[in-house]
């Protein structure tokens, strides 16, 4: 205080002011500080001081020929004095204005191509909508965000090779352009930038912006996609936010969003198949997102999301070392623990075997809408500091932390039995059982947890069991903070292993991820996702399964045909017929399968004769495990369009319609492809197959009763006559042969006689 008073007195004297403002600075230390090194020590001051001078800019001498000495207003544009210490001219800022207005022009055709990212940004801002400004406390948390909209996802090395190839094609040095995206981009850019006069270094810099994802660790409240991050300074301050809707989307955000949706769908589907890991890999390899192979995107895209990371782990890629529980990303910041199996009793006296973490640990928990810091000891929550967007989000974080703490009062708060199952109908592990239970209803958990009086700490308040805030009391160990908890900033990736049930572990054996952690949120992808794998046919519903199954048979007819006659069991077990089974009423699956397999066997018994259309139509039904029964069917039911629809065993129906004239098949009105061969070539083999051991006597004869189906013929006694339904719904009269010797010739005569009987 004394010093300040003294200074004030000194400053009131004019002599002091004069000394401070007029005398030269001649202290060596100060001169050294401001003049040593190339680095400007006070750029703002230097700029102000320079711009106050008449000629603050230096230029090449050639400028004197290119710019007049004075402008139209008679102001001097350059000085005849040389710049001290260089061979350059001193120039006025007015010269820049003159140059911009009257200087030489050049072709601008390449500007939008080189400065593409800037032009696109201007367009997005032009069409964006800025809403009202709201003043409120901003809970910002630092997240790793993409700051560069509109980029491809090349690695720095890949991009470097592309840039060298495009900008400096004649430079020496090995460049290996291997990936598809590298080659496409190089070709495209070389064409675009032919005869480009813009400085190569600038082109290289701009190309880098276009090719490489740049991320920064920034405080964000709200949208994290790159089109929001580019206006971060306009949309959120310390105590205000401005609503904003981007005026356009960029492919990199769309890729990230679509990748997450595809990965979630694939993990969910893989979980319910017989071998989840193999299925997941098969689907990742056969899926395209926006026309690019999903596996290529996974290799390049740094998005961290549970399903995406499971897919990456399956491909043997490294992922982040943090682990996921209850939709929150946990990162241990200090402490350590050992794991031990322990049996505990729930409030319902059910025994659970849990892996207890023994030891003191601290974690950060980061979710979409809430974040927290958790300190815990063995089966005890010491402290939880949570912040979130709203009451609901905060409650979610508290439940997850309470379950994670493994405290006894949490386990005792369970009412009723725990029997949650996953999509494949397998019981969840005990920790997820507890989590699901309390996510459904946490009332008892909060009531039993206990409350404590709290001290008044800046920025922290208490929260009561009914999730209302309080300044006096709070749930034991739990506080709500105004400040968010930053996401884990490191981009370090670790080697992980994955088991066939898609559980991902680090090298110490800790589970980082499992399918239970994959969000059930459904979204609509921005880019087209093409799942070529039959396992994903059902994603678009029953109709898609039906159409896809028949399309697959027709596409692969050549191989299917050979397998049908030589190795039917292998054909029936093909995974492409799996989705179809879900359309067949459960009770009928086995019976239909038995019936169709018998029918096929009868067709096979006679060489070289079968009915293509009928085999295609009935084949998917033969895939279910068959039941041996004598049941006959003239139509088979499939559940589509919300009800059972019939496929006729003989003849067309709205579900399966084969047009003989065009040789095209329509399934539920959708084109399913064309048959390349003539289905009649071995006149409908069903007939000849059936009629082995029978004589055809002629057309239908009503005296012999209603037409029997193929299988019922076997019940006839030798010499007995009957009407029989053959082929596409025609009826003929047959008699069972009295002896078996001439069976072989039957099929040939049958074919001729059927033609006569029908015509």
UniProtKB/Swiss-Prot annotation:
One of its GO terms (cellular component) is virion component. InterPro entries: Flu_PB2_2nd, Flu_PB2_6th, Flu_PB2_C, Flu_PB2_CAP-bd, Flu_PB2_middle, Flu_PB2_N, INV_PB2, PB2_helical. A motif (Nuclear localization signal) lies at residues 736-739. It comes from the Viruses. The record marks 627 as: Avian adaptation. The keyword DNA damage does not apply. GO terms for biological process: 7-methylguanosine mRNA capping; cap snatching; DNA-templated transcription; symbiont-mediated suppression of host gene expression; symbiont-mediated suppression of host mRNA transcription via inhibition of RNA polymerase II activity; viral RNA genome replication. Influenza RNA polymerase is composed of three subunits: PB1, PB2 and PA. Interacts (via N-terminus) with PB1 (via C-terminus). Interacts with nucleoprotein NP (via N-terminus). Belongs to the influenza viruses PB2 family. This is Polymerase basic protein 2.
């Amino acid at each position: 205080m004394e010093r300040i008073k003294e200074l004030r007195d000194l400053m009131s004297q004019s002599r002091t002011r004069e000394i401070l403002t007029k005398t030269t600075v001649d202290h060596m230390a100060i001169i050294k500080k401001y003049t040593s090194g190339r680095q400007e020590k006070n750029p703002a001051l230097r700029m102000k001081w320079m711009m106050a001078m008449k000629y603050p800019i230096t230029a090449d001498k050639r400028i004197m020929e290119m710019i007049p000495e004075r402008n139209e207003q008679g102001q001097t544009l350059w000085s005849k004095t040389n710049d001290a210490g260089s061979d350059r001219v001193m120039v006025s800022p007015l010269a820049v204005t003159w140059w911009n207005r009257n200087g030489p022009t050049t072709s601008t055709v390449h500007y939008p191509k080189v400065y593409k990212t800037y032009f696109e940004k201007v367009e997005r801002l032009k069409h964006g909508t800025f809403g009202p400004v709201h003043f409120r406390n901003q809970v910002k948390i630092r997240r790793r965000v993409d700051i560069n909209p509109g980029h491809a996802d090349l690695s720095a090395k890949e991009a470097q090779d592309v840039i060298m190839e495009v900008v400096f094609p004649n430079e020496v040095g090995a460049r290996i352009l291997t990936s598809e995206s590298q080659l496409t981009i190089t070709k495209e850019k070389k064409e675009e930038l032919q005869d480009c006069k813009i400085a190569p270094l600038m082109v290289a810099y701009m190309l880098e912006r276009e090719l490489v994802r740049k991320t920064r660790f920034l405080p964000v409240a709200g949208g994290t996609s790159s089109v929001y991050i580019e206006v971060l300074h306009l949309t959120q301050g310390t105590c205000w936010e401005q609503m904003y809707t981007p005026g356009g989307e960029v492919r990199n955000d769309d890729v990230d969003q679509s990748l997450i949706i595809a990965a979630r769908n694939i993990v969910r589907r893989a979980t319910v198949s017989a071998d989840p890991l193999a299925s997941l890999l098969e689907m990742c390899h056969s899926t395209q997102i926006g026309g690019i192979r999903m596996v290529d995107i996974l290799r390049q895209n740094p998005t961290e999301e549970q399903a995406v990371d499971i897919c990456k782990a399956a491909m043997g890629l490294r992922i982040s070392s943090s682990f996921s529980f209850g939709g929150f990303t946990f990162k241990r910041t200090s402490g350590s623990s050992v794991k031990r199996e322990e049996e505990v009793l729930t409030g319902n006296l059910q025994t659970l075997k849990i892996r207890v973490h023994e030891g003191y640990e601290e974690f950060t928990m980061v979710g979409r809408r809430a974040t927290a810091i958790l300190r815990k000891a063995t089966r005890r929550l010491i402290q939880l500091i949570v912040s979130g967007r709203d009451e609901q989000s905060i409650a979610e974080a508290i439940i997850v932390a309470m379950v994670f703490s493994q405290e006894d009062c949490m386990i005792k708060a369970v009412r009723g039995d725990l029997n949650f199952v996953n999509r494949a109908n397998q019981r969840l592990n005990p920790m997820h059982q507890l989590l699901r239970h309390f996510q459904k209803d946490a009332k008892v958990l909060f009531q039993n947890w206990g409350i404590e009086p709290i001290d008044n700490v800046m920025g922290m308040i208490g929260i009561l069991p009914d999730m209302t805030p309080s300044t006096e009391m709070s749930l034991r160990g739990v506080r709500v903070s105004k400040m968010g908890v930053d996401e884990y900033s490191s981009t370090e990736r670790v080697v992980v292993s994955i088991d066939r049930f898609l559980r991902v572990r680090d090298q110490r054996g800790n589970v980082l991820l499992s399918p239970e952690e994959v969000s059930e949120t459904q979204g609509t992808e921005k880019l087209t996702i093409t799942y070529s794998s039959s396992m994903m046919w059902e994603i678009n519903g029953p109709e898609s399964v039906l159409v896809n199954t028949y399309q697959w048979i027709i596409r692969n007819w050549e191989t299917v045909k050979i397998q049908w006659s030589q190795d039917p069991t292998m054909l029936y077990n093909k995974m492409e017929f799996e989705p179809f089974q879900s359309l067949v009423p459960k009770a009928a699956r086995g019976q239909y399968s038995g019936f169709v397999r018998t029918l096929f066997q009868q067709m096979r018994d006679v060489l070289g004769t079968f009915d293509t259309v009928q085999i295609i139509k009935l084949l998917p039904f033969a895939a279910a495990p068959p039941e041996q029964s004598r049941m006959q069917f003239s139509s088979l039911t499939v559940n589509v369009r919300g009800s059972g629809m019939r496929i006729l065993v003989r003849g067309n129906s709205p579900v399966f319609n084969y047009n003989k004239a065009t040789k095209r098949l329509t399934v539920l009105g959708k084109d399913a492809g064309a048959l390349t061969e003539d289905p009649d070539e071995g006149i409908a083999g069903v007939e000849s197959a059936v009629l082995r051991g029978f004589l055809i006597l002629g057309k239908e004869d009503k005296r012999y009763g209603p037409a029997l189906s193929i299988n019922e013929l076997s019940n006839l006694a030798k010499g007995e006559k009957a009407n029989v339904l053959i082929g596409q719904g025609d009826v003929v009269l047959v008699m069972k042969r009295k002896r078996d010797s001439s069976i072989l010739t039957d099929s040939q005569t049958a074919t001729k006689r059927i033609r006569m009987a029908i015509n």
